[in-house]
Amino acid sequence: WRDAPSFFNYITRCQSFLQMGRPDNDFLIYLPVYDMWNEQPGRLLLFTIHHMDKLAPKFIDAIHRINNSGYDGDYISDNFIRSTRFKDGQLVTSGGTGYKALVVPAAHLMPSDVLTHLYELAKQGATIVFLENYPTDVPGYGQVEQKRQSYQRTLRQLPAVSFSETTVTPIGKGKIITGTDYARTLASCNIS
């Protein structure tokens, strides 16, 4: 195809401009993939971004509620949470992008080391938001009792709150915010 070199040069130029930009979303939003897999019937565990409304209706509802509250966010997985740090007043991902807070929307399953890392980030100065509930258990069956014990130790360190009210609890240099009213709870992050 004779136009291919020109077309590829155009794509290269466009990509260069796109890569010069910086994301400016307000929040990191925890992607509860273990909840999604747990709720899928059968043994074929697929993850396709184009059918999220069918695979994860609760998560998509939470995303709509966050967006309708006037905020936007980027999804983050367990693996990327593990490498996220708190630096210069922001949560910074391994890619170097900074965010003002991390939101966990109504997740039920979360690895114990991820919950512990979120608590440590709050102690360092980060804002961590739990909407509707704290996660209640760890995923999987490998070393499940050991993981549950570790999980329960961290869970006992989190503020004992009624999620029916928006609560801001100082944790070290940061804070943990809890609640079920998305607009009010997210507004407590003081992000404009």
Where do the model's predicted regions map?
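Carbohydrate-binding surfaces of carbohydrate-active enzymes
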Residues: 1-192
